């Protein structure tokens, strides 16, 4: 039986996620349609690019409402990555479409004349609230690539922050909903540990 469902939105490449799971010897199910979901109540939702195309891609495959129902009613745990994390919120300044609304906040664009946007490269996370996602992680540097973010460093759902122009939420959690703005699949051993922790401890 698969240990995890990986949503293939059609926007972005899931190859890096698959390689990490192969390295960790986890069985997984790639989700292209609602019928593909296994009974394993864990979902990874990776995403890159822009907000609206990402949401539209999920809707075109009839995945958006199904994911919403699985998370809210059947209590599947979900880990959103990059744009996947942003989609967990109400909306984004980048687009017009609503997100899943699992988290009551919106995504905003970095605003700075001193820093280059997008924020691309390695940056440090500062853990604000104990969470199993960070268990056994010593190196706190992760790889980021984004122009929009969640500027809510003091909100209860924020479990780690990072500074780029200002503090932002680099990892979030509320009940069975988890999100990371960085790319764990591109962050070497510490990123692998994030994915392992989600699968094993969620």
Locate the predicted segments by residue:
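Acyltransferase
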Residues: 180-202
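Cysteine-nucleophile active-site neighborhood
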Residues: 49-119
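Pocket-forming structural segment of enzyme catalytic cores
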Residues: 90-165
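Short hydrophobic segments within beta-strands
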Residues: 7-9
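Short acidic low-complexity segments
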Residues: 27-39
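Extreme N-terminal starter segment of soluble prokaryotic enzymes
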Residues: 1-5
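Short, Asp-centered acidic motifs that coordinate Mg2+ and/or phosphate
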Residues: 42
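Short, surface-exposed beta-strand/loop micro-motifs that present aromatic residues
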Residues: 166-173
